[in-house]
Amino acid sequence: MESQRSFSSYRKRFGTPGGSPSVGVTSRHSTGRLSLHSSPRHLTSSPLTLSTSRLSLGGERLDFSADSLLKAQYRETRTNEKVEMMGLNDRFASYIEKVRFLEQQNKMLVAELNQLRGKEPSRLGDIYQEELRELRRQVDGLNAGKARLEIERDNLASDLGTLKQRLQDETALRQEAENNLNTFRQDVDEAALNRVQLERKIEALQDEINFLKKVHEEEMRELHEQLMAQQVHVDLDVSKPDLTAALKEIRAQFEAMANSNMQETEEWYRSKFADLTDAANRNGEALRQAKQEANDYRRQIQGLTCDLESLRGSNESLERQLREMEERFAIETAGYQDTVARLEDEIQMLKEEMARHLQEYQDLLNVKLALDIEIATYRKLLEGEESRITVPVQNFTNLQFRDTSMDTKLTPEAHVKRSIVVRTVETRDGEIIKESTTERKDLP
């Protein structure tokens, strides 16, 4: 007699002895249906074989060898089942410990994941946004400072251009003044040369006047001597009053001529000396004016040179400050860019770590689901084992010995009934959704 019921994905089969127990779990996430199967194994011992009691009817003796053989086989079966159950219990205990550990790890990961979902991303985002806003404010401030410095640089460049133009103008004026000064120096040199020449002429004229005076005195002396000699000769020879008058007249004429020549010479000398003195005075005044103008131009050139050096120093200082500020701004900008890149890398790393935690959490959920399925499977296996253990005892009680006494007639054969129960359980997400039982009864 054999009865069949509906089968599910998980099957518990009984086959020939010697099969080792093994359980396989297959998870299908697409449909949520879990397929559990087990390899064929024997949860019962070898079938009970009862040999007929050999009864010696002639001597009226009952042979209980069949009974002792049945008891030995049953004892061996129970021992094997006990050892097998102990191994299954140990494996089940280890699985339970593993499940507890994984559940604890799962709880820790869930708590960490909730913490990361609830706190860290938002706080990290706020920190990132705050730092980003701060960096943007600093960049805006630096841009404003840069614009201000560029305006100042443009103003300084304009002032520098104005000063350069002024310097060029002043340099042109200085060159013109130097040219005028050189011209005045030439004029002064010419005036000094003319003065020296005039002084030499004056000295020559004075020498000539002195010489003429000497010549005139010598002539007057000679004339006087001649007159005296003529007067003596006249006095000796002719002592007439008309000769004396003539001599006086001649003397008066010569004296008048000498006086006129003397006056003309003195007047010419005075006029020449006055002309030379006026020319020298005029040249001296022009020389003093030229020297004064040269000194004024020299003072102006010195003042402009000092202003130019001061402006050059200020320009160099401002250019140096501008270069330093540009370098500092470039360094700070590079630092801010590195900070932004580092923060972006940290955010990317946190995102990747979060994704990894999510993947680990999903894997742990899958493992937990598989373990829940295995636990449910082992629970059903244990329940099936408990129900199977009760079967041999019931079958053993069903053994009937027709002849139990010496004077009774023993049936030639003892009939043994065997019953095999196969329970099939179908689970989904740790819950039993379908359960079926197949029972087979074999008659020897």
From Swiss-Prot:
Residues 390-444 are annotated as: Tail. PROSITE patterns: IF_ROD_1 (PS00226), IF_ROD_2 (PS51842). GO terms for cellular component: cell projection; cytoplasm; intermediate filament; type III intermediate filament. Its main location: cytoplasm. It is found in: Cytoplasm, Cytoskeleton. GO terms for molecular function: structural constituent of cytoskeleton. The keyword Coiled coil applies. GO terms for biological process: intermediate filament organization; regulation of chaperone-mediated autophagy. This is Glial fibrillary acidic protein. It comes from Danio rerio (Zebrafish).
